[in-house]
Every structure is written in structure tokens, then in C-alpha cells.
């Protein structure tokens, strides 16, 4: 018997908080209110479909022709505005409304009749045949039900609603069979450990930082990976990649296969590691990254980080960016930095508008080979690779894993994003005030 298709509607926490606040403010007394999300459909797998919100709208009181505790009707001009600006461009729509009272709400007979007719109307009125998802909440927005109608308005399917960072289904059977390996991590809660075990992580860049990161996050409990890196191991990598050997170099191992080897040493069974020995530009890499719950980029160039950020924005996935830098002052003393950045999921700022990566450098790196060689010395010493040491990479990777542990366990709030820079030998952590990174006109995230 075939498994049923799982349909989910996933809203980032910050976006949901803003939407919920706007809905509650739009209610004057105890009348019903309605809000709209306009979504992109993402076919994650054969049996999993995810609807990703691109924008939301909550009508103001003057947008209603009628509004009471028993129902509501939008004005025709406002409804036409929604149709022309969002459905005609190919987005699907989610209607969210409230019912009076507390506790699990039910769809009413009026809901059934209206939604059935509306699902048929929008699918027949637009070339892209948009789908209707509807959700009903109690008056406090604590309990809800969601469903998606077919295009004829005759049947509907249940939709799972998620407003957390990670949309991960955990195996309830694991509750009764805790893994002894993680006994020393019980303090963080068994539910959080199960979430780590089920989390699917895309790691872009399996070099000096990425390999250490994979070892650390793997030992924390992450077993499901997509590894992306086109490079092979070289002798100059051996000073900073744990477990890498000269024999691997001579056998021309791809870095993704080396990192898979690290993970499989931790989990001889029960892990799933997909290796993609290509650049992030490949369509295969892009498709696989989009299926992951978390994207981590640990590359040494700006172009791949820009690509990772674009994928994270398009598919509404949390992104963690890791990097280090070493240079020499005029008195020949070193300055060493590591940086951990997590842009807010759903917009606000990104790696580009936050100036965490350089679009100019990204353009240089994506240019034809002859131009790339000509400008490659900008910021580099020609003929010499970027300086890198194991211990600095380890600080960066360890902090990145700590941040992810906090995101999963809930003891670190990243709704507004974080940007942390560590400086050595001053041993100083500088935490950027992310309010200064916010942008209202970024080409990428606004």
C-alpha cells in the first residue's frame, strides 16, 4: 500500500509572529478576522509537498464589506487587488480565519460551502490553476486545523502546519529506545535529541571548516546529510582536516567522500549521507540542498555563499554561514578572525545586504577563467593559498555547532538573525547589532 502524500505549510517563526500580531490587532471586538499567505509550491519528494510563504496580507477594517462574529465579506476592489497581484503571478493562496471561542476549532458549514466554491473559482480563473489552502484558528491563535481543496472544490486533504525553524517529523518509537551514545546529552531533552537525529543538513564546503563541523555535528546526533564540494583532497589540506591521510590524497579522494567517511565512522549504520562532488551551481546540488532542513555554507569564496543564501531565501530554509580570515599587521603580528552568521529566515537582512559577503568578489569569482586569474590577487597573495590553521577553524566550526544546538533546543533565539565575529589574540567575541543590518530594499531578501 502506497504511503499518503504529506502536505505541509511552513511559516518561519518571525513571519508568523508578525502575521499573528497583525491579525489580533485587526480585531476590534470579537468578530472574525481573515489573513492571507501567498505561497510557492515545493515538491520536496515524491510523497512530500511543502508550501512556502512568499508574502502575507491582513486586511484593514475598511477592506471588509461585512465583518461580524458569524462571518465576513471582503470588498470587491480589495479582493480584485489580491487576485491580480498574487494569484495571477502563479502563487497559491492560504486563507486563515478565526472562530470565536477557545480550543480546537472546526470548519463550519459556511466555511465548507464558501471554500469549495472559491477553490473551483480560482483554479478555473487563472492559467496556473492556483490551489486553496484554508486554516481555522480559535480566537487566541492556540489551536488550528488546515486543509487543501482539490481544484474542483469537491474534496480536501489535511495539511500540516509548522511555525518553527525546522519542519522535522520525529519517530515516536525512538522515545522508548533512547540511544546510549547520547546519554550525556539528556539534559537538553529527549525531544531535542530526536530532532537532531532526524534533522537533514546540507553542508556546502567540505574543507578545513566543513570537515570539523561535520565531525562535531555528527557526534551531537545529526545522521542525515547532503555534502556538496567539487574539490579533491590535497597534501596542503592535511594540516587542518581531521582523519585525512596522505594515502587519501594519493588516491584522489573527493572531499565529500572523505567527510562521508568521517560520518560513517561515527554511525556504521542508521545514517544517510548523500555526496555531490560538484559545485553548488549544478542543478542536482540545488535540488538536493532544497530538500534539507538546514543549510550550512563553509566555503572559502563569496560566490558559493551568495548561491547558498539565494537557495535559503527561495526555499525558506535556515542558513548558517561559517568563515575564518588571517592577515598580518605591519608589525608582523597576526590578526585572526572567525565569523558565524545566521540571517533571519524569511527576510529582514541577508549575507548580501548585511555586507557579510562581497557581491563584487562574488562576481569576480563567477567570471570566466582568464578574468578570474587577473583579479584573483585582490585580497590574496598571488600564488599563495589563503592562510588557515586547524585551531581557528575548530573555533569557528564548534561555535557553528553550538549555534545550531541552540536553534534546535530553543535556548538561542535567531529570529532576528545573528552575526558573531571572534578576534584573536584579543579573544574577543563581537556580536553585531542586527538592527543595523536590516534592509527594506535589498534585491535579494525584500
How would you label these PLM feature ranges?
Residues 1-94, 100-169:
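Conserved beta-strand-loop surface patch within small alpha/beta domains used
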Residues 124-125, 138-151, 167-172, 195, ...:
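Glycine-rich phosphate/adenylate-binding loop
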Residues 129-131, 269-270, 315-317:
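A short helix->loop->beta-strand "cap" motif at the edges of active sites that frequently abuts
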Residues 171-201:
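A short, basic/flexible loop-to-alpha-helix module at the beginning of a structural domain
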Residues 189-232:
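Glycine-rich adenosine-cofactor-binding loop
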Residues 209-214, 235, 302-307:
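Short glycine/serine/threonine-rich phosphate/pyrophosphate-binding segments
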Residues 224-268:
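Glycine-rich phosphate-binding loop and adjoining beta1-alpha1-beta2 segment
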Residues 256-294, 299-305:
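A structured beta-alpha segment of the ubiquitous adenosine-cofactor-binding alpha/beta core
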Amino acid at each position: 500500500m502506497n504511503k499518503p502524500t504529506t502536505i505541509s505549510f511552513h511559516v518561519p517563526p518571525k513571519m508568523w509572529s508578525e502575521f499573528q500580531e497583525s491579525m489580533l490587532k485587526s480585531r476590534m471586538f470579537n468578530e472574525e478576522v481573515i489573513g492571507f499567505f501567498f505561497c510557492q509550491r515545493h515538491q520536496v519528494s515524491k510523497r512530500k509537498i511543502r508550501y512556502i510563504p512568499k508574502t502575507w496580507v491582513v486586511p484593514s477594517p475598511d477592506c471588509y464589506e461585512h465583518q461580524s462574529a458569524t462571518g465576513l465579506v471582503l470588498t470587491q476592489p480589495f479582493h480584485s487587488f489580491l487576485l491580480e497581484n498574487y494569484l495571477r503571478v502563479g502563487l497559491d493562496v492560504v486563507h486563515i480565519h478565526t472562530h470565536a471561542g477557545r480550543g480546537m476549532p472546526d470548519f463550519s458549514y459556511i466555511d465548507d460551502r464558501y471554500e469549495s466554491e472559491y477553490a473551483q473559482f480560482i483554479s478555473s480563473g487563472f492559467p496556473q490553476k492556483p490551489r486553496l489552502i484554508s486554516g481555522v484558528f480559535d480566537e487566541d491563535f492556540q489551536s488550528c486545523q488546515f486543509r487543501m481543496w482539490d481544484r474542483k472544490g469537491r474534496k480536501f486533504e489535511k495539511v500540516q502546519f509548522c511555525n518553527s525553524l525546522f519542519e522535522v517529523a520525529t519517530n515516536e518509537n525512538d522515545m522508548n529506545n533512547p540511544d546510549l551514545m547520547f546519554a550525556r546529552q539528556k539534559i537538553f531533552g529527549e525531544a531535542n535529541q530526536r530532532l537532531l537525529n532526524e534533522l537533514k543538513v546540507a553542508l556546502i564546503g567540505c574543507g578545513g571548516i566543513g570537515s570539523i563541523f561535520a565531525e562535531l555535528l555528527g557526534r551531537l546526533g545529526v545522521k542525515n546529510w547532503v555534502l556538496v564540494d567539487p574539490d579533491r583532497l590535497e597534501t596542503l589540506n592535511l594540516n587542518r582536516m581531521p582523519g585525512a591521510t596522505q594515502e587519501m590524497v594519493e588516491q584522489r579522494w573527493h572531499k565529500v567522500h572523505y567527510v562521508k567517511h568521517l560520518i560513517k565512522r561515527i554511525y556504521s549504520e542508521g545514517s544517510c549521507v548523500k555526496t555531490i562532488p560538484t559545485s553548488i551551481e549544478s542543478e542536482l546540488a540545488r535540488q538536493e540542498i532544497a530538500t534539507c532542513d538546514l543549510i550550512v555554507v563553509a566555503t572559502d569564496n563569496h560566490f558559493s555563499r551568495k548561491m547558498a543564501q539565494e537557495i535559503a531565501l527561495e526555499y525558506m530554509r535556515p542558513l548558517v554561514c561559517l568563515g575564518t580570515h588571517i592577515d598580518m599587521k605591519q608589525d608582523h603580528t597576526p590578526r585572526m578572525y572567525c565569523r558565524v552568521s545566521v540571517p533571519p529566515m524569511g527576510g529582514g537582512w541577508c549575507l548580501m545586504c548585511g555586507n557579510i559577503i562581497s557581491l563584487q568578489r562574488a562576481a569576480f569569482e563567477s567570471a570566466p577563467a582568464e578574468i578570474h586569474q587577473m583579479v584573483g590577487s585582490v585580497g590574496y597573495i598571488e600564488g599563495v593559498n589563503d592562510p588557515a590553521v586547524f585551531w581557528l577553524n575548530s573555533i569557528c566550526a564548534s561555535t557553528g555547532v553550538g549555534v545550531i544546538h541552540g536553534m534546535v533546543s530553543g535556548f538561542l533565539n535567531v529570529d532576528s538573525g545573528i552575526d558573531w565575529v571572534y578576534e584573536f589574540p584579543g579573544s574577543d567575541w563581537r556580536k553585531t547589532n542586527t538592527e543595523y543590518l536590516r534592509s527594506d530594499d535589498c534585491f535579494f531578501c525584500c
